[in-house]
Structure formats: C-alpha cells, structure tokens
C-alpha cells in the first residue's frame, strides 16, 4: 500500500497535463513504513529523453536522480518510488516500464490528455521483476 496526500496527487496530475504530449516524470519522497510507503512530497524532474521519444518514454538521468536523493536526505526523507505520465494512453505499465523498474519502489502512472489528467494508479514490481501488481492507494 502507498499512502499519499491529495496535494501530492494533484501535483502529479498537473505535471502530467503541463508536459503533455510528452511523458512527465519525478520522484516520490517519504518513508518506508510497516504499513507500506508514505509519500510526503513529490520531486518533479524534466524528462531527459530525446525529443523524438518523449511521447512514450521518460528518462531520469543519474545526475538528476542523485540531486533528488540529496534533496530527500536533506529533509530526512527517502525515495520511495517514481511517477510518470502516459499521454493519451492508459495508466498501466508498459513492457518498457517493467524492464526498467526496480523492485521495492512504487510506480504511480497517470493517464493524461491535452487538458486533463484521467486515471491514476500505483504499481509494484514483483521481486523477480516478472510483472507489476496493482498497489492500493490510500489518500490522506
């Protein structure tokens, strides 16, 4: 289960609509807790993928990931997951998403159109990396 506030969910949705028709991306910051992950902050990142691929791929560079991890540590937080958008596509992980994900983390995907965010779901990867499972979202 992932626990997240309305404010953070709205930030993800707004980022997705703002970056449409390209995929947006960012980090989910908070804590790993006994009851699951608790998100207290989002950390938006610019999609570093080349222009021709941004419509269906995102890239977080190692430098940006380190910046985000440093930002989290300075606030006594952890990276508990990632988010990205699927412009004009369902909010379900692609095969590419599966191949590039890491177990343990949450992956929030929001489906966007030019003027609105649609479905938003969270996913967790199996430890053997074979597939994603839907993750319950608790909104606070």
Q: What residue ranges belong to the model's regions?
A:
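Conserved beta-strand-loop surface patch within small alpha/beta domains used
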Residues: 1-79, 87-140
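Conserved, mostly hydrophobic/aromatic
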Residues: 82
């Amino acid at each position: 289960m992932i626990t997240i506030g309305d404010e953070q969910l709205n930030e993800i949705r707004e980022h997705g609509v703002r970056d449409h028709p390209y995929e947006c991306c960012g980090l989910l910051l908070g804590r790993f807790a006994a009851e699951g992950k608790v998100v207290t902050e989002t950390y938006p990142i610019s999609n570093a993928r080349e222009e021709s691929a941004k419509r269906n791929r995102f890239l977080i560079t190692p430098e940006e990931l380190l910046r985000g991890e440093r930002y989290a540590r300075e606030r006594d937080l952890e990276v508990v997951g990632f988010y990205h958008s699927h412009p004009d596509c369902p909010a379900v992980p692609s095969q590419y998403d599966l191949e590039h994900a890491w177990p343990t983390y949450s992956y929030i995907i929001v489906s966007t159109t030019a003027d609105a965010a649609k479905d938003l779901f969270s996913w967790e990867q199996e430890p053997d990396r074979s597939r994603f499972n839907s993750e319950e979202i608790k909104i606070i």
